[in-house]
Swiss-Prot record:
Database matches in Gene3D superfamilies: Glu-tRNAGln amidotransferase C subunit, N-terminal domain
The EC number(s) this enzyme carries: 6.3.5.-
Matching Pfam families: GatC
Family to which this protein belongs: Belongs to the GatC family.
Major enzyme class: ligase
Protein role: Allows the formation of correctly charged Asn-tRNA(Asn) or Gln-tRNA(Gln) through the transamidation of misacylated Asp-tRNA(Asn) or Glu-tRNA(Gln) in organisms which lack either or both of asparaginyl-tRNA or glutaminyl-tRNA synthetases. The reaction takes place in the presence of glutamine and ATP through an activated phospho-Asp-tRNA(Asn) or phospho-Glu-tRNA(Gln).
InterPro entries: Asp/Glu-ADT_sf_sub_c (IPR036113), GatC (IPR003837)
Reaction(s) catalysed by this chain's protein: L-glutamyl-tRNA(Gln) + L-glutamine + ATP + H2O = L-glutaminyl-tRNA(Gln) + L-glutamate + ADP + phosphate + H(+); L-aspartyl-tRNA(Asn) + L-glutamine + ATP + H2O = L-asparaginyl-tRNA(Asn) + L-glutamate + ADP + phosphate + 2 H(+)
UniProt-listed GO biological process terms: glutaminyl-tRNAGln biosynthesis via transamidation; regulation of translational fidelity; translation
Keywords: ATP-binding, Ligase, Nucleotide-binding, Protein biosynthesis
Entry protein name: Aspartyl/glutamyl-tRNA(Asn/Gln) amidotransferase subunit C
GO molecular function: asparaginyl-tRNA synthase (glutamine-hydrolyzing) activity; ATP binding; glutaminyl-tRNA synthase (glutamine-hydrolyzing) activity
PANTHER family, sorted: GLUTAMYL-TRNA(GLN) AMIDOTRANSFERASE SUBUNIT C, MITOCHONDRIAL (PTHR15004:SF0)
Length: 102
């Protein structure tokens, strides 16, 4: 089994994409932990599953929920009147992401 390594720079890049910030000690800790996790996946990849039938569920449960059918609600105006901000028939919400060109 070859050991998978991940660099602090890669962890910092993923953290930036996820809008997270870590100090140097946290980056070191997460780099070690993520490397360990990747190595666990390498170990799992070595398991011989050729004789195992693929499944999507380990139980034979049947979905007993109702059909997902769209219905016309006819109360849009009331909803918009109760929304804090509305424009052009839509509810306006504050932006949560900054455009950084990525």
């Amino acid at each position: 089994m070859s050991e998978t390594t991940i660099s602090k720079e890669e962890v910092a890049h993923v953290a930036k994409l996820a809008k997270l910030s870590f100090d140097d000690s946290e980056l070191t800790q997460f780099t070690t932990q993520l490397g360990d996790i990747l190595n666990i996946f390498n170990t799992l990849g070595e398991v011989d599953t050729a004789a195992v039938e693929p499944t999507y569920s380990v139980t034979e449960n049947v979905n007993h929920l109702r059909d997902d059918v769209a219905h016309n609600w006819h109360q849009k105006q009331g909803l918009l009147e109760n929304a804090p901000l509305a424009s052009a028939g839509l509810i306006k919400v504050p932006a949560i992401l900054e455009d950084e060109g990525e």
